[in-house]
Amino acid sequence: MKNAPLTLNFGSVRLPVSADGLLHAPTAQQQLGLTQSWEAALVEHGLPETYRDFGAGPEAAVSVPDFVALAFALDTPEARRWQKRARELLARAMQGDVRVAAQIAERNPEPDARRWLAARLESTGARRELLATVARHGGEGRVYGQLGSISNRTVLGKDSASVRQERGVKATRDGLTSAELLRLAYIDTVTARAIQESEARGNAAILTLHEQVARSERQSWERAGQVQRVG
C-alpha cells in the first residue's frame, strides 16, 4: 500500500515534504520564482546539496530554514510575496495574535505537542492571575521572584536556573513537561484563591500562605505516588 504524500501547508500554499521535514526543491524553486538552475542557486547562496525520496526516487531537497533564507535573499516577485507573508506573521506574533499559535499547533502532527501548548498557556495564565492578586494585596519587590522559586522547588525539586541549564532552554517553562506545567498552574491557582479568601496582605503573609499551599500539594502528590506504586 502506497502512503499518501506528505505536505507542509502555509496558507493556500502546499509544499511537498519528506518524512524528516525537508522540502521538495523543484516545488520550492517554483514558489520562489528561481529561474537559474537549482545547483547554481546552491553554490551562489552557500546551501548544502541534499536529496530525499518524495515518492519517485531521490530528488533535490531543501530545509525549511534554507528555504526561508532564499526567500529573503532573492528579489523575484514570488520571493517578495514570501517576504510579505513573513513580515505579516512577525507583526501578528509581536501583537499577541493567538490565531498564529493556533495555526502553528494545527500544523504540528504530534498530539503531545498540542497538549504541551495547552498546558503552557494554562500555566502562564495562572501565573499572571497570581501576580495580579499579589499586587492587589500589597505584594511588592522580591516577592514575585520568591513565589516562583517556591513553586519551582515544589514541582521540580530545584530552582529555575538549574532547570534552564539542565534542559537547555532560556525560559524555564519552555523546558517543562505538560505534567509539570499543569502542577505549577494548579499551585498558582490555589495560592491566588487562598490569598483572596484569607485577605492576606504584604509580602510575609503572602509568602507564608504560598509555602503552605506548596507544601500541602507536594505531600498530596507524594501520597498519590506511593498509592500508585503499591497498586
Curated annotation (Swiss-Prot):
<dbReference type="GO" id="GO:0071465">
    <property type="term" value="P:cellular response to desiccation"/>
</dbReference>
<keyword id="KW-0227">DNA damage</keyword>
<dbReference type="GO" id="GO:0006974">
    <property type="term" value="P:DNA damage response"/>
</dbReference>
<comment type="function">
    <text>Appears to contribute to D.radiodurans capacity to survive exposure to ionizing radiation. Likely functions as a DNA damage-induced nucleoid-associated protein (NAP) that contributes to the enhanced level of nucleoid compaction after irradiation by bridging DNA duplexes, thereby limiting the dispersion of the fragmented genome immediately after irradiation to facilitate subsequent DNA repair. In vitro, binds both ssDNA and dsDNA, and is able to compact circular DNA, circularize linear DNA, anneal complementary DNA strands and protect DNA from nucleases.</text>
</comment>
<comment type="subunit">
    <text>Homodimer.</text>
</comment>
<dbReference type="GO" id="GO:0071480">
    <property type="term" value="P:cellular response to gamma radiation"/>
</dbReference>
<keyword id="KW-0346">Stress response</keyword>
<dbReference type="GO" id="GO:0006281">
    <property type="term" value="P:DNA repair"/>
</dbReference>
<keyword id="KW-0234">DNA repair</keyword>
<dbReference type="GO" id="GO:0009295">
    <property type="term" value="C:nucleoid"/>
</dbReference>
<keyword id="KW-0963">Cytoplasm</keyword>
<dbReference type="GO" id="GO:0005737">
    <property type="term" value="C:cytoplasm"/>
</dbReference>
<protein>
    <recommendedName>
        <fullName>DNA damage response protein C</fullName>
    </recommendedName>
</protein>
